[in-house]
Amino acid sequence: MHLTSREQEKLMLFLAGELAAKRKARGVKLNYPETIAYIASHLQEAARDGMSVAEVMQYGSTLLTVDDVMEGVAEMVHEVQIEATFPDGTKLVTVHNPIR
């Protein structure tokens, strides 16, 4: 199987997001890379599920709270940006201050 660099990047993001989700489910507080991967992978899946750009942006701000991440991580994450594949094409999605 041959994957383009973009496909490889999406796959790595998915895997990192899955690892972060498993850790979160076990009650482990997420570090910075895990936090970004968790949010970004959920945004990718929401776009593929057919949500609009506005819905994905709103959804992204509901995924994690300050209690889900290590101390200081919420202050480090000002925004998460991804290129998500929607039914009508690829679009840039930005979620500002995603951890509330």
Swiss-Prot record:
Cellular location(s): Cytoplasm
Catalytic activity: urea + 2 H2O + H(+) = hydrogencarbonate + 2 NH4(+)
InterPro entries documented for this protein: Urease_gamma, Urease_gamma/gamma-beta_su, Urease_gamma_sf, Urease_subunit
Pathway(s) where this gene product acts: Nitrogen metabolism; urea degradation; CO(2) and NH(3) from urea (urease route): step 1/1
Disulphide linkage map: none
Gene Ontology molecular function, alphabetical: nickel cation binding; urease activity
Pfam families from the UniProt entry: Urease_gamma
Protein name: Urease subunit gamma
Complexes and interactors: Heterotrimer of UreA (gamma), UreB (beta) and UreC (alpha) subunits. Three heterotrimers associate to form the active enzyme.
Record's keyword terms, sorted: Cytoplasm, Hydrolase
GO cellular component, one term: cytoplasm
Organism: Haemophilus influenzae (strain PittEE)
Protein's UniProt keywords contain Hydrolase: yes
Main localisation: cytoplasm
Listed GO biological process terms: urea catabolic process
SUPFAM superfamilies noted in UniProt: Urease, gamma-subunit
EC number of the protein: 3.5.1.5
Enzyme class: hydrolase
